[in-house]
């Protein structure tokens, strides 16, 4: 992958206008499509397979008047007045008759109707007008909502001064999130951090511009998707938040690597290609981990959450693609002007501001002025160097302090409560929130979240008495304040019971009441013969919260298990992945603890503009776990991969490893990567934190959790706990069983393939024209070597016969040359392309004919040469036993032009006969049975 990214980076650098115009064109198409086809977001939460959802579906079929969404108008009389006064009751009745004509309204309940009870408060200070709509909240038109609010405003004006009217209910329980100026502050902070990091205004704009283009494209595609999918209003904002954060960071990693290389003297074009191949490989790996975690949200089996995860993963995928293409393109615009201003050296100027003279090595001067000789000044150590030295010098104290500290910070997480958003979570300036609070104050909190029980009563001879008896039974259950309604439908085949709980819809006691009502199912079925289901908006919200709570453990096992597997593959270590996974769990627990302390305990609720203390949105934990997992892996990879690189190089130089060498590698690797990781973490924190003060009530706890989680994971876990634990483990940190090392695949996330290509650029000679060059090639399976020390050179148009007592060895060598099998040692270049790095190109340009066991060997050979492959490998020439078959095969090779042919056979004479008949010269023989001795060129 790194070699492909290397080529992509070079191409993007050379053609910056093409890349930029291509992305802008895609953005224009997506934006135009969104403007034409988008249908708006949908906040209707549903959860198939639950009792609440089944109840709603049953009501929609048999009792549609009760299955749709509802709203309510709360009227509160002025002090000293009652709503039963003529000035109030007449105005309310007039409003009720006006509302009945609204489009989509099925029924309006007059609180003064003699058939209705409970809609006028006990003290007469307030009344509720209930409205029932056709369909769910998303089916009600914006015009109807606006008209309903207008009726409320007109009623307010007609009532005596001091009275209050507020419109709310389920229809208005969801607020539409919006972008405020505060979010722009996060972007400006990110720009400032980029300027400081790059020490260049020009370079600072590149990550920001690429991230904005990627986010705009992702959001446009999300709105296009609303034309054929149900997408919640929180989804675009989540995509913006994630897309900005990872988009800026991914471009930062590539641009920072490029700047360091240019400062070191690498040419700008070569540097852009290398940065894309090396840092870009890590970016792709990091992006894939985030994608997997987001797609893993489908574990909860909740459609809207699955859609949210997919939409957010699209934003991350686009951020990766933009980073590896648009970033090198931006670098191509400025060429070599990326170094930035020089860091001011404190030792280069005197206190008076005059430059100090540079030290001289002139021996004569030193001898003539011996009194002025002094020891050279020590280079000033950076903060990162001093920090990691202190951490690794006291690893036990550091480890214990971090674990205990994060454990204490996680304590509030035990009290974290979850619920779907309702009007009570909206700002106090919201009319829906005012209606919610007025209802709670005058009628009790349960009136904001009534429950519905419904069932088929077609077998009853007296449906009215049956519903009355059921209401009496249910009113006895603890937690039920009153049964507001118990009635059959017009056809008397379905009954509905509306229950008002004593507690608010997001109170845990209401969830307990739902479970208790369901626990009464069998008893009521036996006694009354009615199969009752508990449903309604509140019950659906509780079911979703329960489903999400149940999904946390399997999702946690998924992401932790995934981190163990991925990091084991990347770092070839057992202890590093375990340490990383445990660190991730500490970060998540601490982030949960901070969110609970703010939203449940009320700490810093005022400064953070938290309007209501209470439960947080149900899908906050699973989204926080998924996103933080991907970001934590980012920091782990960028920090620890540099430590591993330094350790491997130091071990090779020293011929072995000990604890001191391993600790030095931890320190040097940390110091080399701390600047970029620090900048990336600060940027992510700024972007996430900007969504907290004025953010949507649903997004606010997610943004706070991510902001805190990023700070804790980057600075406390990765940059403090990780080096301490690595110092404790010493050289054992990089231990891995040999059998596991052989079994696991290799991921090149640090661009080792690019580095190898650069190192072997002139091997075997600059601009070689050889078709195949192999030097000390080895292929082993476990402890068994299929072949070893295979060295050969074949020029274009020549041939090679590979022979061995074991046909598997010859076939393995040919498949290695064809790019189908990766060698385990040695060097190999095919048609100018180094293997295994360029195996994809070789596979598409080298034909393979496996004659042994083929039904028609000639047809197999014909298929291999089809398309004009410049190199053809033919395994098992022994299958061409008859002269006639061999002649036909030779004719196929002749007709193919002049490809380079590599043939394997246990009997080399058969292969010679085939090649002679094909009129080929310059044939070499490689005998793998003789320890792959140098090839013999035959005349």
For each predicted feature, which ranges?
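Short hydrophobic beta-strand immediately N-terminal to the Walker A/P-loop
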Residues: 800-803
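A short helix-turn-beta junction within AAA+ P-loop NTPase domains corresponding to the substrate/partner-engaging
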Residues: 913-934
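Loop/turn-to-beta-strand initiation segments
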Residues: 868-871, 895-904
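Helix-to-loop junction immediately C-terminal to a conserved catalytic motif
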Residues: 818-819
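Membrane-embedded transmembrane helical bundles of large multi-pass transporters/channels
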Residues: 1-39, 105, 136-418, 529, ...
């Amino acid at each position: 992958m790194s070699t492909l990214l290397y080529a992509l980076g070079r191409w993007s650098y050379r053609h910056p206008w093409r890349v930029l115009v291509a992305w802008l064109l895609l953005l224009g198409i997506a934006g135009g499509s969104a403007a034409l086809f988008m249908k708006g977001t949908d906040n209707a939460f549903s959860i198939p397979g639950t009792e609440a959802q089944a109840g709603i579906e049953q009501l929609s079929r048999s009792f549609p008047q009760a299955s749709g969404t509802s709203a309510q108008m709360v009227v509160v009389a002025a002090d000293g007045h009652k709503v039963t006064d003529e000035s109030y009751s007449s105005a309310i009745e007039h409003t009720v008759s006006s509302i009945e004509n609204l489009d989509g309204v099925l029924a309006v309940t007059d609180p003064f109707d003699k058939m209705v009870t409970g809609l006028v408060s006990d003290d007469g200070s307030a009344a509720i007008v209930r409205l029932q709509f056709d369909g769910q909240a998303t089916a009600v038109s914006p015009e109807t909502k606006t008209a309903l609010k207008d009726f409320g405003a007109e009623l307010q004006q007609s009532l005596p001064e001091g009275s209050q009217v507020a419109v709310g209910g389920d229809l208005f329980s969801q607020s539409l999130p919006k972008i405020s100026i505060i979010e722009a502050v996060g972007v400006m902070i990110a720009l400032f951090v980029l300027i400081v990091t790059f020490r260049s205004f020009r370079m600072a704009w590149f990550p920001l511009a690429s991230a904005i283009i990627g986010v705009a494209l992702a959001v446009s595609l999300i709105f296009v998707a609303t034309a054929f999918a149900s997408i919640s209003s929180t989804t675009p904002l989540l995509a913006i938040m994630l897309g900005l954060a990872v988009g800026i960071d991914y471009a930062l990693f590539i641009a920072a690597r490029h700047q360091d290389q240019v400062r070191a003297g690498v040419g700008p074009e070569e540097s852009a290609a290398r940065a894309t191949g090396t840092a870009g490989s890590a970016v792709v790996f990091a992006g894939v981990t985030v994608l997997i975690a987001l797609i893993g949200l489908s574990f909860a089996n909740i459609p809207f959450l699955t859609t949210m995860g997919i939409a957010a993963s699209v934003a991350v995928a686009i951020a990766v693609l933009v980073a590896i293409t648009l970033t090198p393109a931006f670098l191509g615009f400025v060429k070599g002007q990326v170094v930035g201003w020089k860091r001011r050296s404190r030792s280069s100027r005197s206190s008076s501001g005059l430059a100090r003279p540079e030290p001289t090595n002139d021996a004569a001067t030193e001898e003539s002025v011996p009194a002025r000789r002094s020891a050279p000044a020590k280079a000033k150590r950076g903060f990162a160097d001093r920090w990691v030295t202190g951490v690794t010098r006291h690893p036990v104290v550091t480890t214990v302090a971090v674990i205990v500290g994060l454990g204490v910070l996680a304590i509030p997480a035990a009290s974290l409560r979850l619920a779907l958003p309702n009007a009570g979570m909206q700002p106090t300036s919201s009319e829906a929130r005012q209606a919610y609070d007025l209802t709670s104050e005058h009628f009790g909190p349960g009136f904001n979240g009534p429950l519905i029980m419904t069932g088929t009563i077609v077998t009853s001879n007296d449906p009215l008495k049956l519903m009355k008896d059921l209401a009496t039974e249910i009113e006895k259950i603890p937690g039920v304040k009153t049964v507001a309604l118990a009635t059959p439908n017009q056809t008397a085949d379905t009954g509905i019971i509306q229950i008002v709980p004593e507690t608010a819809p997001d109170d845990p006691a209401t969830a307990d009441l739902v479970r208790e009502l369901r626990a009464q199912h069998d008893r009521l079925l036996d006694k009354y013969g009615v199969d009752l289901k508990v449903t309604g908006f509140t019950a659906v919200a509780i079911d979703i919260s329960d489903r999400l709570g149940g999904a946390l453990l399997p999702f946690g096992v998924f992401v932790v298990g995934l981190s163990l597997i991925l990091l084991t593959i990347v770092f070839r270590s057992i202890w590093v992945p375990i340490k990383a996974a445990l660190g991730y769990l500490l970060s998540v627990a601490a982030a949960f603890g901070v969110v609970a302390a703010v939203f449940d305990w009320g700490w810093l609720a005022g400064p953070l503009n938290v309007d209501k203390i209470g439960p947080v949105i149900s899908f906050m934990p699973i989204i926080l776990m998924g996103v933080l997992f991907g970001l934590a892996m980012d920091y782990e990879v960028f920090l620890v991969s540099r430590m591993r690189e330094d350790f491997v190089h130091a071990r090779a130089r020293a011929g072995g490893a000990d604890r001191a060498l391993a600790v030095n590698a931890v320190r040097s690797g940390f110091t080399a990567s701390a600047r970029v990781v620090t900048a990336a973490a600060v940027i992510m924190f700024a972007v996430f934190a900007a969504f907290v003060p004025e953010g949507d009530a649903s997004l606010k706890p997610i943004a706070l959790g991510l902001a805190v989680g990023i700070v804790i994971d980057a600075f406390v876990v990765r940059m403090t706990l990780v080096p301490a634990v690595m110092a404790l483990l010493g050289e054992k940190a990089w231990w891995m069983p040999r059998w596991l090392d052989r079994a696991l695949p290799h991921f090149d996330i640090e661009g080792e393939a690019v580095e190898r290509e650069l190192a072997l650029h002139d091997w075997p000679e600059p601009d070689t024209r050889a078709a195949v060059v192999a030097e000390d090639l080895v292929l082993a399976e476990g402890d068994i070597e299929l072949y070893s020390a295979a060295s050969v050179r074949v020029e274009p148009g020549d041939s090679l016969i590979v022979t061995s007592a074991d046909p598997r060895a010859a076939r393995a060598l040919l498949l290695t040359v064809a790019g189908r099998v990766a060698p385990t040692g040695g060097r190999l270049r095919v048609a100018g392309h180094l293997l295994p790095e360029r195996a994809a190109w070789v596979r598409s340009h080298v034909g393979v004919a496996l004659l042994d066991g083929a039904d028609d060997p000639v047809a197999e050979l014909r298929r291999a040469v089809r398309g004009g492959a410049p190199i053809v490998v033919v395994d098992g020439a022994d299958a061409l036993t008859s002269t006639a078959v061999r002649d036909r095969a030779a004719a196929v090779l002749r007709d193919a032009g002049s490809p380079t042919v590599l043939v394997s056979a246990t009997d080399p004479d058969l292969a010679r006969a085939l090649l002679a008949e094909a009129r080929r010269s310059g044939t070499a023989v490689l005998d793998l049975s003789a320890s792959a001795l140098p090839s013999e060129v035959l005349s």
